Amino acid sequence: MTTDYAALGRASLERLHAATGRARQLQLEELEHILGCNAASAYGRRYGFSDIRSVEDYQRRVPLSCHEDYEPYVERLLAGERAQLTCAEPVYYAITSGSTGVPKYVPVTAEDMLVHYNGIYAGVFGMVREYYAQEQPEALFGKIFQVGEFARTRLPGGQMCGARSASLYQWLDRDGGFDASDYCVPKEVLFPDRVEGLTYAKLRFALAERGLTAIHGVFLHRVVGVLDYARENWELLLHDMEHGTVDAASGLSGPWRRKLEG
């Protein structure tokens, strides 16, 4: 392991447990922080963030809103304007599935990414360590099978974009520095250059990795789908692994076929 997942998770849970004892005060401090940091943004100026001194002030000044209310600000951000919704520049644009109409763009800042990393991503390791308290860390934190892939997708202006569930990994590798050595697949499988179904390829690597200790997925249904694929294509996978071949039924494109056959 290159990352101390036990320590990372322990620190995350310690922060969580400490926060639960003063949740209301932390929420008030967070509101004050958000208002102070974004008072000079277009949205903050519109609703007078700099003059808000209490929750009641906030409730009086800032109306309930939906995504339509933010769309003009997002459009200006995408056009190159700055400090619209937040003073910090977005580092990622999450794109919704469009299930209720046209897909929506949701700007995400670096601060939000750090909250995601230190709370959600790291917290999972803490919960695993806490639940299996009698196990040694090396028995829990070996090679990882991440069932998702995080294609390097960008908007025409160069901003990182994609599904919110992929955003953290894309951001962690924003400069190409994400260390994938703890994962059972090569880095190019985790971060393909384009969106492509790579379940077959990932399973080939996962089934061959004897040090595998964890299966990761943002959504459980994705994990179930990968396991269903393995169950339904068991003989094909084993045959190809034994003979170093890639069956046409894998659906892989030429470059990926050549990587596995080579």
Indicate where each model-derived feature is located.
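Active-site phosphate/ATP/adenylate-binding loop shared across adenylate-forming ligases
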Residues: 1-26, 31-262
